[in-house]
A protein has these predicted regions:
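C-terminal interaction appendages of subunits in large macromolecular complexes
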Residues: 1-244
Length: 244
């Protein structure tokens, strides 16, 4: 005999994750973890000393990883284990498409701050540009962060909003300091403009962002070298060699 049942479909509602602020930690080997904010406050000194990247972010946000081969990988904060302070982190390779054997991290930040900022991109061939961080607010786990010429690679990606000047340093020991506003704002799909005229065979190995009111000192040939003292020039000039 036929039984007619008034069976309603059972709907399982996924429990919404409670939104909260956590502290993201990543060491120089690319092992990442999130910890409770109060655990960070208690272990602040050790956390800052042992980790390359330390910042607070929402557990509903994403972490953006910009690498030297012109890629940006993103990881949901919720996918990064929330652990006790002394627990080990998880390699970025296991949580994203990032491949530590093939690429190097240049800049790591939460998407919430990336999209509010302007980023400076600098390549070894001295191409540079400013890009609105909103261009990196995408759903894909990996995107091309910039267009690179063949054989070129990124040497610097960083938040540029607070800064007024840039310094480029080449492998051959040349330095060029100029105003950030000399760099064009462009789309992420563009190659950029030339920052410093390089001699044949020379390439950039460092770029720095400076605030004009603050002194920035690096170690060059084992001696302190103040970047603010470099003659202020124009973009697309030749650099100068320090007399050290």
């Amino acid at each position: 005999r036929t039984v007619i049942e008034n069976a309603e479909e059972v709907v399982y509602e996924e429990k919404k994750m409670e939104e909260m602020e956590v502290t993201f930690l990543m060491d120089r080997f690319g092992y990442m973890r999130t910890i409770d904010k109060s655990a960070y406050e208690r272990n602040k000194e050790a956390a800052n000393a042992e980790n390359k990247y330390v910042f607070n972010c929402m557990n509903t946000d994403k972490i953006c990883i910009f690498t030297d081969n012109g890629k940006m990988h993103s990881i949901k904060v919720a996918d990064i284990p929330l652990v006790r302070f002394r627990d080990k982190g998880t390699p970025a390779d296991n949580l994203s498409n990032y491949d530590s054997a093939q690429e190097r991290m240049l800049y790591v930040a939460p998407l919430a701050s990336v999209k509010e900022n302007t980023l400076l991109f600098v390549t070894a061939a001295s191409m540079c540009k400013l890009v609105s961080g909103a261009e990196f607010d995408v759903a894909k786990r990996t995107i091309v962060s910039t267009k690179l010429a063949e054989e070129d690679s990124l040497i610097f990606v960083g938040s540029a909003d607070e800064m007024e000047q840039v310094v480029f340093q080449s492998e051959g020991g040349y330095f060029l300091r100029f105003q950030k506003q000399d760099i064009s704002a462009m789309k992420k799909t563009s190659i950029g403009v030339r920052g410093m005229k390089l001699a044949e065979g020379d390439k950039l190995d460092h770029a720095y962002l400076l605030e004009s009111r603050q002194e920035y000192t690096i170690t060059y040939h084992d001696k302190p070298y103040v970047l603010n003292r470099i003659k202020l020039s124009k973009r697309d000039s030749k650099g100068t060699k320090p007399r050290i």
